[in-house]
Amino acid sequence: MITAGQLRASRALLGIDQRKLAEAAGLSLPTIQRMEASEDVIRGNVDSLMKLVAALDALGLELIDDNAVSQAGGRGVRLKGTPP
């Protein structure tokens, strides 16, 4: 679904801190901190993960999974356009 690295990269692209992401996703700051401290793919409550992915989408980010076609291959994240 989403890796800790993708989550950190997402925040960096948006220029927001963990607290702002937590607010946007309707999650607690400790939840975001635990997610970012995860090894590789974030595991946890499905509802929390769905809220996180929906918030990143609403903020203008596109998650790239392992199966996406890209020159570099692998997972990543990119801006859809100008962030809101």
Each PLM stretch: what is its role?
Residues 27-44:
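Recognition helix of helix-turn-helix/homeodomain-like DNA-binding domains
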